[in-house]
């Protein structure tokens, strides 16, 4: 389960930003993860709750948006979006794709008080 490691890394960023802004509490966190990141959303939510225990982020709301990955189609020369590893190019049907951001995960926004 690599979700715990991802949550620990995300919490370090969240905690650092909260401290930089003299926050007393982290209320909400918005994250984006790639559809091809192999991250299980329910496991990420569970691990995030564990990592945030007894911290200024305890009890904060986690909002996760799963975003399609971007890929370059070598046959029709377009940037396309894909949501599964075996998806062909939605424009031409080719399997000749180079996925650009298959493992992306980012913190989009943090709400503090």
Curated annotation (Swiss-Prot):
Entry's Gene Ontology molecular function annotations: nickel cation binding; zinc ion binding
Keyword DNA repair (UniProt): no
Any GO BP annotation: protein maturation
Xref: Gene3D superfamilies: 3.30.2320.80
A family per Pfam: HypA
Domain of life: Bacteria
Entries under InterPro entries matching the protein: HybF, Hydgase_Ni_incorp_HypA/HybF_CS, HypA/HybF
Binding sites annotated in the UniProt record for Ni(2+): 2-3
Keywords: Metal-binding, Nickel, Zinc
Residue positions binding Zn(2+): 73, 76, 89, 92
Protein family membership: Belongs to the HypA/HybF family. HybF subfamily.
Function, as annotated: Involved in the maturation of [NiFe] hydrogenases. Required for nickel insertion into the metal center of the hydrogenase.
Protein name: Hydrogenase maturation factor HybF
Organism field: Proteus vulgaris
